[in-house]
Amino acid sequence: MSPKTETKASVGFKAGVKDYRLTYYTPEYQTKDTDILAAFRVTPQPGVPAEEAGAAVAAESSTGTWTTVWTDGLTSLDRYKGRCYDIEPVPGEENQFIAYVAYPLDLFEEGSVTNLFTSIVGNVFGFKALRALRLEDLRIPPAYSKTFQGPPHGIQVERDKLNKYGRPLLGCTIKPKLGLSAKNYGRAVYECLRGGLDFTKDDENVNSQPFMRWRDRFVFCAEAINKAQAETGEIKGHYLNATAGTCEEMMKRAVFARELGVPIVMHDYLTGGFTANTSLAHYCRDNGLLLHIHRAMHAVIDRQRNHGMHFRVLAKALRMSGGDHVHAGTVVGKLEGERDVTLGFVDLLRDDFIEKDRSRGVYFTQDWVSMPGVLPVASGGIHVWHMPALTEIFGDDSVLQFGGGTLGHPWGNAPGAAANRVALEACVQARNEGRDLAREGNEVIREACKWSPELAAACEIWKEIKFEFDVIDRL
């Protein structure tokens, strides 16, 4: 039987407008194991009290609206409303605080990131009483996460498929990202894979343009993969971007990739959308395809410190929606990413259980139970001199992706790939021997240069290249 609830129909209805905090600010509330918890960074308009702003966020992202309505009496708000249960000031900020909101599980459709985000980060972000609003973190309870398939395969299954263990995987984004014909594109793929890389990759905006239609690209890349595998004896792959203008077209491309026998496809999960991504992830699990995820458009959402949504939330959403790889920044390259913050959401992608750790931006303890993990991909402005730091920061369960750092080699694509493979193997061996890569990394690379002319040439060409700018999004 459903629980007995008191409704307004039985106690009378009083029209009018009242403060949100009278209903939605509940500091005495004890959160439940089944609640979805959210941490919002709230910047209210001048004159709006913290409690009212926090309650407004809880109301407008759950059951509330701007005035009392008669139909409130037909249900139990106490059962379904979001609750602002705690508020804490942000150190160093005069008019900013973290509002903690608890949402009952019944507010959300099972297995739908789309519905989850429509509620929690929907209209409330345009609310006039707030100057800015940012979702910093979500706690997804096992009762909800178990309604999702999650990644198609996960880290261990991918390693077993590739028969590659004990080191990061190596990749390369084919450049120039736009303009190559399909045959020349396939040639670049072959050279990189033959030179020693595990994967090559379509760039995020390579779909099906007049200069290179998707079917032609898929065919030439499959030929390149097969040829490189035959010559090297290693399993190879190319991230064939299945992203398209419709879900039907996306699935058609994924089906063709499977028919070609390639091991992995790719999707732009933010521009493509969570519904499309989840559909593709289900297809990939059912048909043995790995799924690489690009995060194109993420910085529009997550780069500003005061408004939007932190990438750790997008990372959790991706793990639920489904993907075996996702781009996660580099810390040392050309793209935004502070070390502690990056490692915080990298753990949220890979590990089963992550403790609350505010020093790394993790607001809630997260238990993924048995959901497979996602490999973080470090990509963007990295080269051989970064290899020791990348190996030390990301560890074995990662993909290190060098686009310009492979194709920009003065001797060509295959030597560029060889240079990266030698640098990686040298760093892994040094680490396994107990050497400190953070302190001795450059020495490790120089030693490897003595027996690898390809690496020596790469080290010479990129010895002065650095991307040293202040990080915008700090803790």
From Swiss-Prot:
Alphabetical keyword list: Acetylation, Calvin cycle, Carbon dioxide fixation, Chloroplast, Disulfide bond, Lyase, Magnesium, Metal-binding, Methylation, Monooxygenase, Oxidoreductase, Photorespiration, Photosynthesis, Plastid
Source species, domain of life: Eukaryota
InterPro entries, alphabetized: RuBisCO, RuBisCo_large_chain_AS, RuBisCO_lsu_C, RuBisCO_lsu_C_sf, RuBisCO_lsu_fd_N, RuBisCO_lsu_N_sf, RuBisCO_lsuI
Site residues by UniProt (Transition state stabilizer): 334
Amino acids binding substrate: 123, 173, 177, 295, 327, 379
Modified residues (N6-carboxylysine): 201
Enzyme class name: lyase
Presence of the UniProt keyword Metal-binding in the record: yes
Subunit text: Heterohexadecamer of 8 large chains and 8 small chains; disulfide-linked. The disulfide link is formed within the large subunit homodimers.
PANTHER family named among the record's database cross-references: RIBULOSE BISPHOSPHATE CARBOXYLASE, RIBULOSE BISPHOSPHATE CARBOXYLASE LARGE CHAIN
The family this protein is said to belong to: Belongs to the RuBisCO large chain family. Type I subfamily.
Protein name: Ribulose bisphosphate carboxylase large chain
Species whose genome carries this gene: Pinus wallichiana (Himalayan white pine)
Lineage, uppermost ranks: Eukaryota, Viridiplantae, Streptophyta, Embryophyta, Tracheophyta
Name of the encoding gene: rbcL
